[in-house]
Amino acid sequence: MCPAPLRLARLLRLLGVVGGLGVLFTACAAKDTASFSLNVVFPSTAMAIASDEVKFIVYDDPTPGACQRIYLKRISNQANLPPVVLDPPPVPVCDLAFGRGAPLDLPIGKHSILAIALRAKQDLLVGCADVALSEEGGEVVVDLALPGSTPLPPLSTCLSVRDACQNRCQ
C-alpha cells in the first residue's frame, strides 16, 4: 500500500492525464467551418423554369473521382453513399435566381457537393462538384445536367426565369 502523499500524487497525475485527453478529444472533434453560398448552372433557361427547387447535399468523401461515383449512385437509386456532412432543406429556384439563397456554414476540407434540381419533388437535373473548402469561404457552383433516363418536362412559354418567378407568363 502506498503512503497517503504518494497516492494523492498518483491520483492528481491521473486526473491531469484524463483532463488533458478530454481537452485533446474536444479540440479534435470540433471542425472549423466557413460560410459558403451554393449556386447552380442550369443547362438552359427552360430547364431552370421547369425546376421548382434545388437540393444540396454535402458528402464527406475526399477521394479523387468521388463526385462521379456519387452522381452515378444518385441517378441509379443506389443507397450506399458516403457520409453526409450537411443536408439542408431545398432552396426555391426563384430564391437562387434572385440571390436570396442563404449562405451555409460548411466544414473546411475536401467534400463532394451534390445538387439536385427538383420538379414536383422528383429529381430532374443532377450535378456534383468535388471541392476543397477553405477558411475564406466563398461560392461553390455546381453544373446541372439531365440524366439520360429522365424524361423532358413540358416547356414553359416563359422566356426568362425572372418572368416565371414573377408569374408573367401565359
Where are the regions that the model predicts?
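Bacterial signal peptide processing site
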Residues: 29-31
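Residue-level signal for mature regions of secreted extracellular proteins and peptides
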Residues: 21, 59-61, 87, 121-122, ...
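Short amphipathic, basic-aromatic surface patches that mediate peripheral association
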Residues: 39-48
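C-terminal motif of bacterial Sec signal peptides marking the signal peptidase cleavage site
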Residues: 25-27
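Bacterial N-terminal signal peptides that target proteins for export
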Residues: 2-18
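Tryptophan-paired
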Residues: 57-136
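Compositionally biased low-complexity segments at domain edges in trafficked proteins
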Residues: 139-170
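Short coil-to-beta strand junction motifs in C2/discoidin
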Residues: 49-54
